[in-house]
Amino acid sequence: MNVVKGLLVSVLCLSSGLLTAQSHHSQWKKVYERDLTDFELSPEGSGLVLFAKSQGRCRMDVDFYGETGKDKYQYEFTRDRLTAGSHREYRYTVASLSEVTKDKIKLVRNEKLNPASGAVKKEFRDIYQYVPNKVLKKYCF
């Protein structure tokens, strides 16, 4: 009986370990970050963060900050092929940027982007150029 219990406990531990490893494996890993403020892409600054998953799948999160709010773009891609995208627009509910906190930001637009759209592809390529080729080759190709 103790052997059966021991075997059952071993199987359960192994199963939960595999599930944990699988869920950890499927998460995005931050591999690159860049402040784009010096490029003057928006009035109050901007930045991008590149995340990678297995099999060359990457996601680029780009934030543009303005005086009245911020825009957040998210692009998923493999190599240089855009596979998905989204755009969220937030407005600050206070007059001064120094007073902005998480509870003082309101989501005013949440849209999926069409990865086949020429305009979306152009926006993606315009930002994609700020990630060094060696980083893209290592994680996204």
Specify the residue positions occupied by each region the protein language model found.
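C-terminal partner/receptor-binding element of secreted or periplasmic proteins
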Residues: 105-141
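Short, linear, compositionally biased motifs with a strong N-terminal bias
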Residues: 10-13
